[in-house]
Structures are given as C-alpha cells and as structure tokens.
UniProtKB/Swiss-Prot annotation:
Pathway: Metabolic intermediate biosynthesis; chorismate biosynthesis; chorismate from D-erythrose 4-phosphate and phosphoenolpyruvate: step 2/7
Annotated gene: aroB
Protein name: 3-dehydroquinate synthase
NCBIfam families: aroB
Organism lineage: Bacteria, Bacillati, Bacillota, Clostridia, Eubacteriales
Pfam families: DHQ_synthase (PF01761), DHQS_C (PF24621)
Species for this entry: Ruminiclostridium cellulolyticum (strain ATCC 35319 / DSM 5812 / JCM 6584 / H10)
Amino acid sequence: MIRHTINLKERSYPICIATDFQELGKTVLSFRQGNKALLITDENVDNYYSDECMKVLQVSGIEVNKHVLKPGESNKTLEAVYGIYNKMVECKLDRSSIVLALGGGVVGDIAGFAAATYMRGINFVQIPTTLLAQADSSVGGKTGVDFNGHKNIVGAFYQPKAVFINVNTIKTLPKREISAGLAEVIKHGLIMDEEYCDYINYNADKIFKFDENVLQYLAKKNCSIKGYVVEQDEKEDDLRAILNFGHTIGHAIETVENFRLLHGECVSIGIVGVYKIAQYMEVLSEQLVNQVKEILLKLGLPVSLPGLDVERVYNQIFYDKKVKDNKLKFVLPRRIGEVFQCTIKDNELIKKVLLDLSN
C-alpha cells in the first residue's frame, strides 16, 4: 500500500492507495475514538463494494450500519443530508463515531457535509470509487450540496481523517465515467506539471486497460499535486483557486444543462474555454489550444457543446464563487504546466469564447 500525507498541522491525514480493501479496517482503527460507524454509499456502488467494506470493518471490531443514497448530481440536495441525519440519530451516532463515504464525488460531498454538521462535526473517511473522486474531490476537505439550481452553494471546508483509495474500483465504471475522471487528472498536469501531462497522454491506453501500476501512479501524483496546493491554501484564499481551472465555465455549463453532462465533461469544455480566452488575450498560440484539445479528445472528452445556450451559460457564470463585485475572475493558462489568475472585464470576450464552444 502506498501512503501520502496531507500536512495540515492538527488536521493532517493519510491518503492510502491500495489495490483492494484489506487495509481499510486497519486504516480506520488508526484514529478511531468510538466503536460506531455509518457507511454512506449510493445505489450503484452499493451493488459492488458495500458488503466487502462492511465485512472488513466488522472483522476489525467496528459496529457499522449503512445508508444508501440515490445516485447522481440531481440528488445532491439538503433533503439527502436530512436523510443521513435521520439515520445518524437512529443509529445513535455520537461525536466519537465515524462516517465513511463510499462512492464518487456526489457521495463524498453529501456525506462529508453531513459529518461536518452533525453534532458540530464527527470524523469521516473518504473511500472514493470513481477516478474523478480519487483524483480530486476526495482530497482537500470541500463538502456540500447544490441548492436552488446552484452547484455547491451550500457547504463547508471539513477535512477527512483519512482517504482510502482502491484503484481497482474504477474497473466497474463505464468508459464515459473514466474519461470524465481523466478531466480532473489532466487538469493537475495542465496547471502544475507538463511532464505529468505527457505521462497521461502517453499512457492513455494503459489507463483504459486498468494497468495497476499506472493507476497507482496517477492516484499518487494527483494526491501529491492537489495536496501541495491544499497545504499552502486550505480555505481557497488564493493559490487553491488554481484547482478550479476550467471550472468557472464548466460549472455554469453543468448547471444550465441540468446535469445532463458529467462533471468532468463540463470541466473539459471549460478547460478549452480558458485556453481560448488566453489565446484571444495573446498569452498563448492557437497551436497550443489545438494541442490541448487533441489530448482531451484522446482521453474521450468533449471539447465543445453544439447548441450551447450562450446567454444562459454567461449569466450562470456570475454565480461562481470567484466572482467579486460582479467581476469575473478566471484561472488562465500561460503554457502547459503554468497558470495565473486574472480578472476579465471584457464580457464580450467571454461571450465570444462561449460562442466558440457552442460550435
């Protein structure tokens, strides 16, 4: 098992990267205070991994119950959190108990928010089963739900006690889900590490063939890059905003399309959008934009959305959490592996780019 530590002083925690769940019980025992745990998962993941995880935990002497959510972003609501609260009370969870989030980013966000707010915070563990969650959402302590049509507008920063990644869980994902996860993977290379981009591009076939060595390297590298950023800026005051690369446009598309597209697909289109903004600002060349588009296409990701409602997406962008005084702040590329933050005052430029993405 590979271990990587996120160093946040008293909130530091390990990321454990394995090829099965055998060490999960040992990982939980390393910090547990009480004997009760609640495993939160969704209907899809429940069919594959819940029984195995619960058995490992029970053998370790942990009294574990289960709560199953409906899958998908459309169910990432306060109502889902209320359901978890009811189960927590029913199971008599207290401040020494543990919440385990077994699933993708939606499960992690909901379960983490419930853990952050129940009894003013109880321990929780992320057990991400999708490539997207393993690469991004399980690390860093962001939790929350959507509200009134706005993505992640209700939430909290709340760090897990541990992240346990079994890289082989992605074998049960549809190819489309794997590609969506690769949007967050390639994002890390685009913002900080050109060599990592080259590695992903070169090993794309091995990723889709579930090469364990490649998958473990991806998990370790993703956690290393994201972990470094989170360690420098836990609450997204400055540097951490670079992790939102492609997300300003991506989140707006995701919301306007009513979550018809996967998160990673929207991020991919958003990445092309920020490269186009940088191109029009003469920061980089059209050739580089096309190079990035070729990589995304190789990973099975969209680079445009024909028929995109430009006006609605443009208006939705202003709900982004980086907006200050009604001014749009973007994370833009300078080259592959380097980005910078920039306030865009030319709203027509944004509309021009959105129009490009709609063709």
